[in-house]
Amino acid sequence: MSDIFEPTEHPHRRYNPLIDQWVLVSPHRAKRPWQGQQEKVNEEQKPSYDPTCYLCPSNKRITGELNPDYRKPYVFKNDFSALLEDTPVPEKSSDPLFQSSQARGESRVICFSPDHSKTLPLLTALEIEEVIKVWQEQLRELGAKYQWVQIFENKGTAMGCSNPHPHGQIWANSFLPNEVAREDRTQRDYLLKHGSVMLVDYVKRELELKERIVVETEHWVALVPYWAVWPFETLLLPKTHVKRLTELSNEQSKDLAVILKKLTTKYDNLFETSFPYSMGFHAAPFNGEDNEHWQLHAHFYPPLLRSATVRKFMVGYEMLGESQRDLTAEQAAERLRALSEVHYKERTK
């Protein structure tokens, strides 16, 4: 083996300053044969309306309630909410090994469109703008009552999505979840140490280097982070300091719709399939502090590795030691960057 380090050939670790953890990169493993589980792919064209779908307009939900005949994004209280608005406070324990705390909150569902067949990349930028407006409205409403509001989407059965109608979720809670609390601490520490905002500095460096950028628009950039864990993981960030979705200008909001369409289209084009992922926004909490250390960003965590049927599993060493990836972040970005911004289903034959 060569004594000269080559990042595309040699195992190495990369540091994620946002969560204060390391990831093991093993590029030499990318060529290993695969005889393990393969995902089932259903490429049947979905109808624009499904009479059996609990989320389509005018249909009856599992609870018996009727959906309105909605024509734009529609929000309703989750029928199987993970959080409740009024829960009693657990009795305080003196035993340090058995601690609990109160968890209050609300869980809501947002149907992106009345069309059962249209995921985000198949919506127009104008239709995605409508989704963003609803996200912002929900943040304003729920942020007045709870310190954390999590906007997210689980897309595809591979990510545990229980209903094929394109939708996301909005959970608001009275506490800072673990991942958010960790990002809050690391960004605060960075500001105290360096006098600048971590992810603003990071965007500037990535825009200079270019090698991990996937999509760039006037106000936004989507990139494969240097410390990515999932094969085609991306981080979506504004180019300037913005703490929350509710603080975006009209131009930034419109441009967010553009880059969301472009990024998710590239994802679908990679293996010409409806690309599964979990995505969500992280932003400054609604805790009454100035939160100048925070920078708005969205994480996209897609599981697919080699094809539409082969996914990455977080098991073994990754559960017991630390996260590990084969493909380098630069290689993943290069593949995504080279893809068309026209969806494979919309190309002229």
Predicted segments, located by residue:
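Acidic/histidine-rich, metal-coordinating catalytic segments
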Residues: M279-A283
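Extended C-terminal subregions enriched in glycine
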Residues: D255-S274, S278
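Active-site microenvironments that recognize anionic phosphate/pyrophosphate groups
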Residues: M1-H165, W171-K243, E251, T265, ...
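A contiguous, surface-exposed recognition patch within enzymatic or periplasmic domains that forms
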Residues: K243-Q252, L256-K261
